[in-house]
Amino acid sequence: MLDEMKTTDLFTSYYAQWIRVYKDGAIRDVTLAKYRMTQTWVEKLIPGRKLCEMTRITYQQLINDYARSHERQTTMDFHHQLKGAILDAVDEGLIERDPTRKVIIKGKTPSRKKIKYLNQFELHSLLSDLHLGKEADWDYFILLIAKTGMRFSEALALTPKDFDFSHQTLSISKTWNYKDGGGFMPTKNRSSVRKIRIDWQTVMQFAELTKNLPPGEPIFVRRDSGGGYEAVYNSTVNGILDRHCKRLGIPAISVHGLRHTHASLLLFAGVSIGSVARRLGHASMTTTQKTYLHIIQELENQDVDLVMRSLANLM
């Protein structure tokens, strides 16, 4: 038990107990899994380190060892997931002084990840290739994400009552726990709870599609024979999307790539970064700016060209 720990006990044992006491049942499963992963790394990097041996030097070495194979932001997350447990150990007298004080966070240089998205012509080709029948299927799912920029788990959680067809709006207030047995879950963050406008064509399509469906049931997740819900896999939808792209001879993208496509088309159309951030449910405009930096830079270059042409025409 945590209250029976001694300074000579292993830090790995303490950290496992700390997670069990303070995090089990208190945080989302996906966040708990990250703490479990941190625990695995601690067991790998300092398996025999005792609580009384946790000094600033030994902690800095732990961070350095982790940073060798991880980017700086990931190392920062690793540090934050350890720090709470360590400060509690200091408060309990299990560690003499705070070893995390003045820690230096290092990490590998992040690889430049260029996001994949379709241009307007390619997206038009993709949507024209969808077979939209009378029942909700993955082609309708692909259409909806392309038109709204929703996250995969948000779209899975949609129910008919989330649509307000008379006002052409869609309420996003929950996600679907597709990774762990199904069921509704909270959104990624508070900013993810939002109401977005949808175009009249999407209104017509989904008003017809959902008119006979149970109001509170997910549109795209079916019930199984036992009364529960069938498992849904990201790879299933990605596979269908991939086949559409290959048949059309356009770049193959994932479902998340559809979200990027939606955002990029809005930015190229001149929609403000703030509006795009709110529509995507980003916690801040900084997230949007970082994710779509290359598009923003391209738009800035276009602005410079426009300014130069305007100035040249003054004479």
Show which residues each predicted segment covers.
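Short, surface-exposed polybasic/aromatic micro-patch for ligand or macromolecular engagement
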Residues: M1-M5, D29, N189
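N-terminal core-binding DNA-recognition domain of tyrosine site-specific recombinases/integrases
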Residues: F11, I19-L94, G133-K134, G228-T236, ...
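DNA breakage-rejoining catalytic core of tyrosine-based enzymes
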Residues: C52, I95-R97, T109-S128, K179-W200, ...
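Basic, Lys/Arg- and aromatic-enriched nucleic-acid-binding interface segment
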Residues: M76-F78, D91, I95-L158, S166
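Proline-centered turn/helix-capping motifs that create local helix->coil transitions or kinks
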Residues: V90-P99, F165-S171, E208-G216
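C-terminal catalytic core of tyrosine-transesterase DNA break-rejoin enzymes
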Residues: D91, L143, K147-E154, R243-C245, ...
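C-terminal secondary-structure termini that scaffold catalytic or DNA-interacting sites
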Residues: H167, D180, M185-V193, R197-M204, ...
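Active-site/catalytic core of tyrosine-dependent DNA strand-transfer enzymes
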Residues: T175, D199-I250
